[in-house]
Amino acid sequence: MALLEIQGLTKKFGGLTAVNNFDMVVEKGEIAGLIGPNGAGKTTVFNTISGIFKPSSGKVLFKGQDITGFSPHNVVRMGLVRTFQITTVFSDLSVLENIRLGSHLLAKLSFWDDLLTTPYQRRKEKELFAKAATLAEFLGLGDKTNELAKNLSHGHQRALEFAIALASDPEMVLLDEPVAGMSSEETQEMMRIIRATRDRGVTVLLVEHDMKMVMNICTNLYVLNFGNKLAEGNPQQICANESVISAYLGSEYKPKC
């Protein structure tokens, strides 16, 4: 069943066509990848899906509903969240406080609940902090809940950003270069987290340049080049595709297929 479907997506910036007539289908429960050279249009696709950009033409469907042009806030409310290339956490808040902020859409607190600190508000806050602690444990941050985010390693900050995204109980998460700048050990841990997230019922679409990671974790791949879809298929098909090898992977990658 298609959870996310992109139909004929085009995004132009003045005379530049960043993405041209792009189609993509992500099935519920899969880990899909969007790959290609720098400047290929991958982040533009993510920004259009998540409501940061409005497309010049085409549609974005999520759970069968047309969400084209939805605001980022409303896209999140639909159950579709994303992370960014640059780590975005609240540096001077603790790990637990950061994750709690990610669940603000679940709080359903009225103005009076917040103003008067009602019993419902206190109970809800307790529940959300307990959930934040559970997510911290799931993301390998269980022993760091009271640490300030700015004191975490790069790998742990990326895990925290992932936890913040998961705190809103999404059905799908978009990961923009989740292992960029990570060590081999940190990359393996992030792969474990992504697979475990999929196993919890969350569909994943990622952009990543670490081809070893992508080929090991993704079930289906889409390749962009100069804004155009160059290829799609499973990892074995993609790494054996001559056009993809020529435009992106390089000839030295072919023997690894």
What kind of region is each of these model predictions?
Residues M1-C257:
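Glycine-rich phosphate-binding loops of nucleotide-dependent enzymes
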